[in-house]
Amino acid sequence: MSYTEQLQRVVRNYEAAGNQLPATAHDIALWAIENGLWEPQRSTLVDRCAEEIARAMREEFITDPQGRRVRVKHVATIEKNGKQAAFWADMRQAPREHMATAFQQRRQQIVGDCRQLKWDMDSYNQNHNIGEPIQMVFDFTLDLEEIEALAAIA
């Protein structure tokens, strides 16, 4: 059983113990720890620390010379010695290759998010929506132009 499946079982146990959803993940985690269903392993603590460091890097912004608020640290998943790892770099010193990879991977994440949104919307429209189908436009060209036009006059 994978770690994710173990955690899903914890949620089922939470419900089976008479706790109802909706609930926060924090409440479920507290219940799991209090009931001895989850203990942090050293690797879990290292992973948690790494996630928090990554979040902090993801949230570091500067204002560039043109006045744009831009993210400073960028991650690219790269294979080295037969293993994939996420490497972070500061865009002010990063090699062009790293930045090109990071930007392309972020674009692919956006495409994946759009695909999932479309599937969710289509499923809702086909299986649960009793009204007019919810429509979504996935061409962001006009959105980007509008945002940039507003920024230019601000």
Where are these regions (language model features)?
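Structured catalytic/translocation cores of nucleotide/phosphate-coupled proteins
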Residues: 16, 33-34, 38, 147-154
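Alpha-helix N-cap/helix-initiation sites
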Residues: 4, 17-26, 39-46
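Short alpha-helix boundary/capping elements
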Residues: 32-42, 53-58
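DNA-recognition alpha helix
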Residues: 10-13, 24-39
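Phospho-regulated, low-complexity intrinsically disordered regions of nuclear gene-regulatory
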Residues: 1-10, 45-154
